[in-house]
């Protein structure tokens, strides 16, 4: 004999439809999802709280909207380095690396930055700049603050160009030690600055393999707040760490 299981006068099938409708996700438009009609003939909708929660989740991961104007850089240690990435006028990222941190927290005797990493950053910046129409090279974004740099490599040398605003030739020291190129500058405090303001300081160590460069032939020139450094390369026949292998 056929029988119907009911709870408080309502068929079990109706209760199951209501439970399934309550667990159903909202549609992409944010409107509730209608389920099969209940016994009353009215559609069953998801609870308002569940709909609001799902909508908030979609907003959390939705990055469309007003473009960001500043990008903080987190270094390899996981801390904010103080460096910035500027955005183009239409909000697209323009990756212009900065040679020095804004607060000069770099330890002159700490771990040096490898030359390969600097050149890789420069290549990435050049690609990003070329892909962003309406910009005038690296100078467009970099001119907004000091500490920008340009690095390039040719067959004869590696060339660095570093912005050190407020400093003159007498404020800058460049030397090579223990396979590293050290660039250090410290300017004079501006009398118009606040009492707590520190004078401009710049420090950077770049790792250079001494067996690939002429460390005693490095040249540096400071002019109009821009330091230019040329590190000549050793020719392959001059390198003592390169040994040709005869192929038989």
UniProtKB/Swiss-Prot annotation:
Induction comment from the UniProt entry of this chain = By heat shock.
Subcellular location(s): the record lists: Mitochondrion
Q: sHSP domain spans which residues?
A: 139-248
Set out the biological process GO terms recorded for this chain's protein: response to heat
Question: Which of UniProt's keywords are assigned here?
Answer: Mitochondrion, Stress response, Transit peptide
Which coarse location class applies to the principal site listed for this UniProt protein? mitochondrion
Annotated region (Disordered), positions in chain: 26-48
Where in the sequence is the transit peptide found? 1-32
The source's domain of life comes to Eukaryota
Fetch the PROSITE patterns from UniProt: SHSP
User: How is this protein annotated for GO cellular component?
Assistant: mitochondrion
The record's family statement is:
Belongs to the small heat shock protein (HSP20) family.
What PANTHER family is this protein classified in?
23.5 KDA HEAT SHOCK PROTEIN, MITOCHONDRIAL (PTHR46991), 26.2 KDA HEAT SHOCK PROTEIN, MITOCHONDRIAL (PTHR46991:SF36)
Subunit structure, briefly? May form oligomeric structures.
Under what name is this protein listed? 26.2 kDa heat shock protein, mitochondrial
Q: Which organism is it from?
A: Oryza sativa subsp. japonica (Rice)
């Amino acid at each position: 004999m056929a029988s119907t299981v009911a709870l408080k006068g309502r068929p079990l099938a109706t209760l199951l439809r209501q439970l399934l409708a309550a667990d159903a996700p909202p549609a992409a438009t944010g409107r509730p999802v209608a389920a099969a009609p209940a016994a009353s003939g009215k559609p069953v909708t998801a609870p308002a709280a569940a709909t609001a929660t799902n909508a908030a989740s979609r907003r959390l991961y939705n990055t469309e909207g007003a473009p960001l104007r500043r990008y903080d850089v987190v270094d390899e240690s996981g801390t904010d380095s103080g460096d910035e990435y500027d955005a183009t006028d239409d909000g697209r990222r323009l990756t212009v690396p900065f040679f020095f941190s804004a607060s000069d927290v770099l330890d002159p005797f700490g771990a040096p930055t490898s030359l390969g990493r600097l050149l890789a950053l420069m290549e990435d910046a050049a690609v990003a700049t070329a892909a962003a129409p309406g910009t005038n090279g690296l100078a467009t974004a970099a001119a907004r603050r000091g500490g920008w740099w340009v690095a390039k490599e040719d067959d004869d040398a590696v060339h660095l160009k570093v912005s050190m605003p407020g400093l003159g030739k007498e404020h800058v020291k460049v030397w090579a030690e223990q396979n590293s190129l050290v660039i250090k500058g410290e300017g004079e405090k501006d009398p118009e600055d606040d009492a707590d303001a520190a004078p401009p300081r710049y420090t950077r160590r770049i790792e250079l393999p001494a067996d690939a460069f002429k460390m005693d032939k490095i040249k540096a020139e400071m002019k109009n707040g821009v330091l230019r450094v040329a590190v000549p390369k050793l020719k392959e026949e001059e390198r003592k760490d390169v040994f040709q292998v005869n192929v038989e």
